[in-house]
């Protein structure tokens, strides 16, 4: 609040400004902001952070960043010079971007719009951004008639890269243009710009699965590089503090429940550093808002991954080929260029969309002859402690330990625990919606004619309940029994305190009408689990118990379902595929992206003992959250 008062205190009252002679009415955006009483450094930072779009945009930025602890930090932004295509070729590249993502999934090239890199990222002080634009304008005017039209491009493919390379003669001209810009920028702004020294190209795809190469190559061959195209030299900037962060976009609103939480507004972007996630709770991440500059904890299911360039700021551009006067494309006032880019759909952030590809259901028993064995691994459903908070027990248990349902998403009843209701603190059940999620998955398996022969699950109650409801959806709850396997429990390092949860024994689970096999002898009993085990121990335990489960079921049915934790989808399948486990930091980041009822399918390759991930026989399950609602607090007037 102090920061807010300080910002407002520096704005001269309106009546005083109107009476003061010499008030700037038609000056530059900076002059107008200064006349409004904003400090010069803040005004320059606001203009740089909004691309000099307008005084209004700069004012909005300043007021939204009142609580930004780095508002007065002199750290400059990072800038880059790209060539971007416009016209028919740009549309063709846009089509390739969309088709390749839809058919083969996202690869690294999708993080940034189609472009040719002319220089490395460089820093420029906020006060010198206008001069940087002048440097680009001067350079373009000198080189305007020296470029080939159309720019000659050649398709190149390798095992993990596809691109359009600029032919050597034209590439040399572009490199000299970039070097001239670097010299002009150094002269006008004293910044150091390093021209791109590698072969100039438009990246179409890289870091993709080898199996996708033929499809991507065929799509790339459909791009007619001789189509009409104007290329524009464009400057973008980004906040240097978040250069190595993951970019996320908010899809649902969230109002903070605690002081360390971040308010979420749909459409805002969040920067997340993997290094800052080591101490966060399951289901939460720590991030920084683009709109406010504030940092805090936020629920991970309220956001989705966004392209790296989604938060970049467009500063202006000039055509290097056509004869339009540069004055019509004024630097720092990029409305025309911005509209052109939005019309092309390049680099913009699209609204949340679910694209369902035609999927052939896995009909396991529809073909005669030997069948391939399949392993399905599924995460549990929505859990009570995540939805209702760490102290959820106080909301639904009275002083005598009696369960009282206080929300429609709470189950009608809970199993009795021999150790008392406090055992639920470390072993929470799933919600009503969690049960519904699980039944939906079971019904989808039934509709796809997928037969499940064996079901194993972690001893966590949320996993047992999820497995039971999947069987209900499959209409197999009276025929199949769940084998509770402690070896499938998640990484014990994530368990709070010095003891493991006091899980409900199989006999008591069965007494609570859950379809549990009370005769099953686990491969890894509870006594063999160690608290705070190492990452290697957890990965090896998961792999070992999965191998033993597969061996146990051989010749007794082809399909095994494991219901466990988000980490299980990776830990139980990685080494089955002959792959080495990833490091613990990457593992943790991957696990955060697996939602409730996340489902994967692994198929054995003949009798080789090697398995591979395949398309699941069911569609994915996506849903949005619903925040708490109290009609008295919201509707009742004082």
From Swiss-Prot:
Q: Cite the EC number.
A: 3.1.3.48
Q: Which residues carry this modification: Phosphoserine?
A: 9
Q: May I have one GO cellular component term?
A: nucleus
Summarize tissue expression: Detected in splenic T-cells and B-cells, total spleen, skeletal muscle, heart, lung, kidney, thymus, brain and liver (at protein level). Highly expressed in brain. Detected in heart, spleen, lung, liver, kidney and testis.
Question: Does the keyword section mention DNA damage?
Answer: no
Q: Name one GO molecular function term.
A: protein tyrosine phosphatase activity
Instruction: Cite the Pfam families for this sequence.
Output: His_Phos_1, SH3_9, UBA_7
Q: Where in the cell does this protein reside?
A: Cytoplasm; Nucleus
Q: Which segments of the protein form a coiled coil according to its record?
A: none
Q: State the residue spans of region: Protein tyrosine phosphatase.
A: 369-638
What does the UniProt keyword field contain?
Answer: Cytoplasm, Hydrolase, Nucleus, Phosphoprotein, Protein phosphatase, SH3 domain
Query: This protein is called what?
Result: Ubiquitin-associated and SH3 domain-containing protein B
Task: Name the species this protein comes from.
Answer: Mus musculus
